[in-house]
Amino acid sequence: MTTAENTKFAKAADGTRIAYQLSGEGPELLLLAGQANNHHWWDGVRDDFAAVRTTITLDYRGTGASDKPTTPYSTEIFAADALSVLDELGVEEADVYGTSMGGRTAQIIAGRHPERVRRLILGCTSPGGDHGFERSDAVRRSLGQLDREAARRALTELMYTPAWLAEHAGPHQTMGDPDMPDHARRLHLRASAEHDAWDLLPAIGSQTLVLHGTDDVFNPAANAPLLAERIPGARLSMIEGARHAYFEEFRAQAGPIVLDFLAGC
C-alpha cells in the first residue's frame, strides 16, 4: 500500500463513483466518518495509525470527490459503498473504525459481512431505531435555528468542550463538508435517521470496542453501554469529559485505547 495520501475511485454497484484515500503502513484499517462529512473528518488523528496500519478513508456518496446522486441514501448503501472500496483494493478483511454515522455504517458492515471485519471500533454512535437514545429536544432546537451561524456555533459546542475551543479556533474538519449540495445533505440526514441495526448487532462476531465521551449529548452517551451489551463480547470505554469529537479533542487518550485494541491488548 502507498504511504502517501492520494485519491482514487471505486465504483459502487449502481455505478456511483466513490473516492477513497490511502496512507500509512501495515494491515488495513477502514476509517468511516460522520454524517455529511468527507474523509477530512480524520485529518486530526489519521497520522496516529500511520506506523502500524494502512488507513483507508472514503468520501461518502454526496460528499467530497465522490458522485452525488439524487436517489435515496442509507447506511446499508454507505456500507456497500465502503465494501466496493475494499473490493477495488483487493482487501478481503480489514479492521473497521466508524464514528457517529460512520459507526452506524460499520455496524452494517460487521453484521452483514462478518468475514470482512477483523476488529471493530464503534465510536460516538448508536444502534438507531426505537432502541437508540435520541438527542434531546433542546439539542434539536439549537441545531435547527434559522440563524445559520448560531446553529453552527451550537454544533461546534456539541462537538468540543469550551476549553478546547478557547485554544482551537478552527476551522474544524468535523463540521460537515462545506461543498456538499443541499440535496445530499438532506439525504445524509435521512440515512442516519432511518438507521436501525438493533436486530443485526448480535450477529457481529468481530472483537468489538465501543468508545464514547461521557459528556456527548449530540449522540447521547447512553448509547454506548447499549451497544456494548448488545454485541457479543464487546468492550466499553468511556472517555471522561469528552463530547462528540472525543477522537480529536481527547486524542491523547483515545488514540492509545484504539491502538492497544488493534494490537490485541
Which residues make up each language-model segment?
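Acidic catalytic loop of the alpha/beta-hydrolase fold
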Residues: 215-219
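Catalytic histidine-centered segment of alpha/beta-hydrolase-like enzymes
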Residues: 242-255
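Active-site loop/oxyanion-hole signature of alpha/beta-hydrolase fold enzymes
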Residues: 57-97
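Conserved alpha/beta-hydrolase catalytic His-Asp/Glu region
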Residues: 131, 150-200
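Catalytic histidine neighborhood in serine/cysteine hydrolases
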Residues: 225-245
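Flexible "cap/lid" loop of the alpha/beta hydrolase fold
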Residues: 107, 111-112, 118-146
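Short beta-strand/loop motif that positions the catalytic acidic residue
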Residues: 204, 210-212
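Conserved HGGG/HGGXW glycine-rich cap/lid loop of the alpha/beta-hydrolase fold
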Residues: 9-67
